[in-house]
């Protein structure tokens, strides 16, 4: 089987002053602190979370 594609997501802006649902999306992606990078699977669910908090994160394919 072929491996699923992954996206590297980095938190580049602080969560202070953001709305609770946006903080929940960042936590759902597995990001804990500034400049923390994680690799998530390229699924519609993860893409939706990334789109919702696009102003807080940087992504690379």
Curated annotation (Swiss-Prot):
GO biological process: translation
Transmembrane segments annotated in the record for this chain: none
Annotated GO MF terms: structural constituent of ribosome
InterPro entries hit by this protein: Ribo_uL30_ferredoxin-like_sf (IPR036919), Ribosomal_uL30_bac-type (IPR005996), Ribosomal_uL30_ferredoxin-like (IPR016082)
Tagged with keyword rRNA-binding: no
Keywords: Ribonucleoprotein, Ribosomal protein
GO cellular component terms listed in the entry, alphabetical order: cytosolic large ribosomal subunit
Ribonucleoprotein found in the keyword field: yes
Entry-linked NCBIfam families: rpmD_bact
Assembly and interaction partners: Part of the 50S ribosomal subunit.
UniProt record similarity statement: Belongs to the universal ribosomal protein uL30 family.
The protein's name: Large ribosomal subunit protein uL30
């Amino acid at each position: 089987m072929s491996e699923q594609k992954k996206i590297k997501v980095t938190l580049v802006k602080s969560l202070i002053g953001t709305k609770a649902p946006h903080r929940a999306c960042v936590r759902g992606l597995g990001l804990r602190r500034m400049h923390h990078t994680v690799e998530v699977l390229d699924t519609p669910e993860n893409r939706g979370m990334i789109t919702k908090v696009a102003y807080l994160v940087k992504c690379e394919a």
